[in-house]
């Protein structure tokens, strides 16, 4: 019996013939679930272009160029996107809401990450602008003061999610991966044709 993790698991180890601690069994089960999700996604949703070139996913950041933006860039560059195999993530940015809206008009961008308040506007202004696009991006609000009120307001007005700052890599990867999958699965046929 392990005092911290409880009794050993009853299943016998195939390789050693000894009982495995519950923690080891849990870790192996978690690893298998992640592996199964990756296999299912790679079989069902290969985001490459058919020539084994990864799909490029652009995250457009609206807000100041600060340490948080550099952290976000590092997360995008160093992450293995297990939920979105066959993707390459890039970051574009603008610190001005009106300039961002103008730039987004000419591009197909799946995800917009917007600071709660930015130069000459708020996330609500960006949401209103991108809401008119044929394939509107998933808007994610970022804030150091992310609370239940902001989360409820953002979701009720049509934002996809809220990320708290400073950015935590696992949470950023989870939210961005789910936003990308949601965007690709809900695009209209007309928007798909326009993007291709």
Residue ranges: model-predicted function:
Residues 105-107, 129-136, 157:
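Conserved phosphotransfer cores of two-component systems
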Residues 54-77, 90-93, 112-113:
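Conserved acidic segment of CheY-like receiver
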């Amino acid at each position: 019996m392990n005092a911290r993790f409880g009794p050993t698991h009853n299943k016998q180890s195939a390789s050693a013939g000894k009982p495995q601690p519950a923690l080891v069994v849990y870790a192996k089960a978690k690893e298998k679930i992640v592996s199964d999700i990756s296999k299912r996604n790679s079989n069902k949703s290969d985001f490459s272009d058919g020539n084994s070139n990864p799909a490029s996913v652009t995250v457009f950041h609206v807000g100041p160029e600060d340490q948080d933006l550099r952290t976000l860039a590092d997360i995008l560059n160093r992450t293995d996107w297990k939920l979105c195999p066959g993707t390459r993530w890039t970051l574009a940015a603008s610190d001005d809401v009106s300039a961002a809206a103008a730039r987004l008009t000419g591009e197909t961008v799946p995800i917009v990450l917007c600071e709660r308040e930015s130069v000459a506007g708020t996330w609500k202004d960006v949401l209103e602008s991108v809401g008119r696009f044929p394939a509107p991006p998933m808007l994610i609000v970022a804030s150091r003061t992310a609370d239940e009120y902001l989360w409820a307001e953002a979701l009720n007005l049509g934002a996809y999610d809220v990320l708290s700052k400073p950015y935590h890599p696992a949470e950023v990867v989870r939210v961005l991966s789910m936003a990308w999958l949601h965007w690709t699965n809900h695009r209209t046929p007309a928007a798909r044709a326009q993007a291709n």
